[in-house]
Amino acid sequence: MLLVIDVGNSNIVLGIYDEERLVRDWRVSTDKSKTIDEYGILFHDLFRLADIVFTDVKDIIISSVVPTLTGVLEKLSRQYFKISPYVVGPGIKTGMPIHYDNPKEVGADRIVNAIAGFEKYRTALIIVDFGTATTFDYVNKKGEYCGGAIAPGLAISMEALFMKASKLPRVDIARPPSIIAKNTVNSMQAGIFFGYVGLVDGIVQRMKGEGKENPKVIATGGLASLIAPESVTIEEVDEFLTLEGLRIIHQRNK
């Protein structure tokens, strides 16, 4: 079995693959203060509930945008699984040309998504990933990563409103009943939710205009299923895109 680990600023997503089949996945909160042993116990408990033991895992690949946790999970892999993991970054074969001023600056998760998207759809793509930040990535018809855009995520935007406006409460991210809201909570939700839908559609439409390839637009990430139904540009939600990308990169580096 293959263990794939996607480390984001807010969540760590784990997946277990048996060949090409995703047999189990988990999403846990990212905690930079946790030690190797604390993460080891967490992994053990998750695996035990799924009737999986550490020795079932024969290989590990990690994608991380949190440098401090990259090292922790590398050490965990060696200590608990007795495996030297693959880490997405310089030296890893991706099979995708990266057209960026400094390719090392592109987040590992963005490249992983691009690889998975092109492998699956074989056409020009815009990939919208709803994470701590929301990223927009363009892949052309030749399967080349062309760049993209980064915007503050939904949760960051809502938290900033609460932190900076003293009379506004902290509220959940949700679709309100109407854009013309009748109370403060719904008003905040209306501004963030519908404003974000507009942001997504606006950026995607501008990218389509520049790219001129009629790209397919897919969304992934924790909040993709919330925004996608209201979007006029998102065509499909692929919640396991990043995990699938890690599996593909592992295959290309075996």
UniProtKB/Swiss-Prot annotation:
Q: What is this protein called?
A: Type III pantothenate kinase
Q: What class of enzyme is it?
A: transferase
Q: Which residues bind K(+)?
A: D129
Question: What's the domain of life for this entry?
Answer: Bacteria
Keywords assigned by UniProt?
Answer: ATP-binding, Coenzyme A biosynthesis, Cytoplasm, Kinase, Metal-binding, Nucleotide-binding, Potassium, Transferase
Q: Which reaction does it catalyse?
A: (R)-pantothenate + ATP = (R)-4'-phosphopantothenate + ADP + H(+)
Q: Which organism is it from?
A: Geobacter sp. (strain M21)
**Positions with a binding annotation for substrate:** Y100, G107, A108, D109, R110, T184
MF annotations from Gene Ontology: ATP binding; metal ion binding; pantothenate kinase activity
Q: Where in the cell is it found?
A: Cytoplasm
Ranked from the top, the taxonomy reads: Bacteria, Pseudomonadati, Thermodesulfobacteriota, Desulfuromonadia, Geobacterales
Query: Which InterPro entries does the entry link to?
Result: ATPase_NBD, Type_III_PanK
Role description: Catalyzes the phosphorylation of pantothenate (Pan), the first step in CoA biosynthesis.
- Return one Gene Ontology term, BP aspect: coenzyme A biosynthetic process
Q: Which GO terms describe its cellular component?
A: cytoplasm
Question: Subunit arrangement?
Answer: Homodimer.
Cofactor binding mode and count: A monovalent cation. Ammonium or potassium.
Q: What is its EC number?
A: 2.7.1.33
Q: Where is the active site?
A: D109
The cofactors required by this protein are: NH4(+); K(+)
The text of the family note is: Belongs to the type III pantothenate kinase family.
SUPFAM superfamilies xref list: Actin-like ATPase domain
